[in-house]
Amino acid sequence: LPILEMLQPEIQSVQCLILVPSRELGLQIEQVWKKMGTDYKVNVCYGGHSIDTEIKNLSNPPAVLIGTPGRIVDHIERGTFRVDKIQTLILDEFDKSLQLGFHEQMSFIIGKLTKLNKRVLVSATSDIEIPRYTRVVNPTILDFIPENEAETNLSMKMVVSKGKDKIGSLFNLICSLKSQSAIVFCNHRDAAERISDSLNEKGIYATYYHGGMDQDERERALIQFRNGSVSYLITTDLAARGLDIPEMNHVIHYHLPSKEDEFTHRNGRTARMTASGTAYIIAHESEKKMDYIDYGMEVFKVENATSLPKQPEFKTI
């Protein structure tokens, strides 16, 4: 809404640039913008999408342009849109973009915005040297972390797997929870597919989601999960943030991420605001222990499943 107030209808050029680390986040922001019912045009640009189509769309300049850093650099170098009227730059999921190696592209873009009124809004979840990356001197920091981080509605429980292959433990956990849906996080694309296939063979309706899928496949998987056609989304950290996914009562860590930040984002899919949720960690004694995990947490014992969870209702997608 503050961005809306700053836009000027008489300026027929891009006035606000939003950089995002992924096309999914960009498309989500575009959808939210359109739901606001504003007359201001918005476009989204990202790698893997037809650049010719994007160039055609940008010939009638939007007031708000959303894009991944690499694709925005490409358009700037081609001179597809003017940068001299951009007054607001938003770096959404700024820390994620840095983790993905977009530092050089973001520096290039910021360097081109010479007439920027220094309205730089940064979204980050880790301790980042904001002035170093954004060229902003003495920025105003808005900290939304609760004063007492211990006051959380998230509980964590450990499921000890007897075997290195944790499929059996995951299956029994799902059946024990009797939950109609959950997100299962793993660390590798092939693992997401393997786990999904194994669960389906056991009668659990699941689908996988990862960065190796093309855009149509990924969107189809999300639609299936959102509308309840499948109950379990088996995914990499790609779904840990930046996606419009309903809040879950449970998230399950089949693998633990190497970084605590990603663990935090995964858990952010549950226990939002005043809601309660539980994160389950499936662990085997042979696995590397992570410094950020309290291995003395409550152990959740699962028995061999005797019945399957309620099957989802099939819907048209």
What does each model-identified segment do?
Residues 1-317:
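Conserved helicase RecA-like core
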